[in-house]
C-alpha cells in the first residue's frame, strides 16, 4: 500500500512538530501510511533577506504574502497523479467531513498556509480548493492545516485501531452521534440510562437512533433540514413532539 502524501507550505514549520505526538497521526507516520513534508516558505524568499511579504498596493494595514515565494515552493513539490492543492483562507468554503472522505481517495494533498494580512490574489490560481474551518479569522493557516491532516489521516485504512469507531461518528451521517456512557453506572447522582445496561440490543439501537435525531434537531437543525423536510424541525424546542435529551 502506497503512503498518502501531505505537503505543507508554511512560514511556521515548527507549528507542525505537534503531529509527532498526536496519537492517530503518529501511528500513521510510524506505519508509513502517510508522509508529511514541510516546505518552509522562508527558504523560497526573495533577495538576501529572503523576503516573503510586502506592503499591499493601494495602501492598507499589515503585510501581504508575495506570490513569487509561494509559486516557487509549490513548483518545487513533486506532484502525484491524484493530487489537489488546498488554500487555507477564511474566505474559503467551510470544511465538512465529506471533504475528508473525498480527499482520502487521492495520492496527495498540498496545503498552502497564509499569514499576516493574507496573500497576493494571484496565489489563488494555484489552488484546486479554498478551505476555511469556520467563520472566524486566525493568525495563520497552520491550525486549519493541522485540522485537515488529522481529519484526513484517521480515515486512511490501518490508521485506527478499531475501524468500526468511524461508523457512528458525528458528521459521518446527517445526524450527530448519540450520547455515550462508561463506568461507573452512577456518578454524582447521574445515572446511566437503564436501556444501555439491560442487554437488549434492539432497544439499545432504537434508543441511540432516537437520540441521534433529537440531538441533531436540538443542536444542529441545519444539518438535516434537507433530509427530514417533512418534519416541523424549525418548530421543535426540545419539549414537544420529541423527548428531551
Curated annotation (Swiss-Prot):
CDD domains (UniProt xref): TrmD-like (cd18080)
> E.C. number, please?
2.1.1.228
InterPro entries, A to Z? Alpha/beta_knot_MTases, tRNA_m1G_MeTrfase_C_sf, tRNA_m1G_MeTrfase_TrmD, tRNA_m1G_MTases_N, tRNA_MeTrfase_TRMD/TRM10
Q: Which domain of life is it from?
A: Bacteria
Name any one GO molecular function: tRNA (guanine(37)-N1)-methyltransferase activity
Q: Does the keyword Electron transport apply?
A: no
Catalyzed reaction equations:
guanosine(37) in tRNA + S-adenosyl-L-methionine = N(1)-methylguanosine(37) in tRNA + S-adenosyl-L-homocysteine + H(+)
TM region(s), chain numbering: none
**What is one GO cellular-component annotation here?**
cytosol
- Keyword ATP-binding listed: no
Q: Subcellular localization, per the record? A: Cytoplasm
Listed A to Z, the keywords are: Cytoplasm, Methyltransferase, S-adenosyl-L-methionine, Transferase, tRNA processing
Family membership, please give it. Answer: Belongs to the RNA methyltransferase TrmD family.
What is the recorded function of this protein according to its Swiss-Prot or TrEMBL entry? Specifically methylates guanosine-37 in various tRNAs.
Q: What is this protein called?
A: tRNA (guanine-N(1)-)-methyltransferase
Which species does this protein come from?
A: Prochlorococcus marinus (strain MIT 9312)
Underlying gene: trmD
Amino acid at each position: 500500500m502506497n503512503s498518502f502524501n501531505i505537503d505543507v507550505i508554511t512560514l511556521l514549520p515548527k507549528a507542525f512538530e505537534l503531529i509527532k505526538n498526536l496519537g492517530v497521526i503518529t501511528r500513521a507516520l510510524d506505519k508509513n501510511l502517510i508522509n508529511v513534508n514541510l516546505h518552509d516558505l522562508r527558504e523560497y524568499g526573495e533577495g538576501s533577506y529572503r523576503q516573503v511579504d510586502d506592503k499591499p498596493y493601494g495602501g492598507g494595514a499589515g503585510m501581504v504574502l508575495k506570490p513569487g515565494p509561494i509559486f516557487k515552493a509549490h513548483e518545487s513539490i513533486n506532484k502525484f497523479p491524484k493530487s489537489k492543492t488546498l488554500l487555507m483562507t477564511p474566505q474559503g468554503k467551510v470544511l465538512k467531513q465529506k471533504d475528508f472522505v473525498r480527499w482520502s481517495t487521492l495520492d496527495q494533498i498540498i496545503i498552502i498556509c497564509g499569514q499576516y494580512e493574507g496573500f497576493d490574489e494571484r496565489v489563488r490560481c494555484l489552488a484546486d480548493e479554498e478551505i476555511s474551518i469556520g467563520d472566524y479569522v486566525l493568525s495563520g493557516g497552520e491550525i486549519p492545516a493541522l485540522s485537515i491532516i488529522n481529519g484526513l489521516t484517521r480515515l486512511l485504512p490501518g490508521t485506527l485501531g478499531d475501524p468500526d469507531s468511524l461508523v457512528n461518528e458525528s458528521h459521518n451521517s446527517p445526524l450527530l452521534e448519540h450520547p455515550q456512557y462508561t463506568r461507573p453506572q452512577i456518578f454524582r447522582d447521574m445515572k446511566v440510562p437503564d436501556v444501555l445496561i439491560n442487554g437488549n440490543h434492539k432497544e439499545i439501537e432504537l434508543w441511540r437512533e432516537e437520540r441521534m435525531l433529537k440531538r441533531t434537531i436540538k443542536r444542529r437543525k441545519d444539518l438535516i433540514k434537507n433530509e427530514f423536510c417533512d418534519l416541523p424541525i424549525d418548530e421543535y424546542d426540545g419539549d414537544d413532539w420529541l423527548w428531551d435529551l
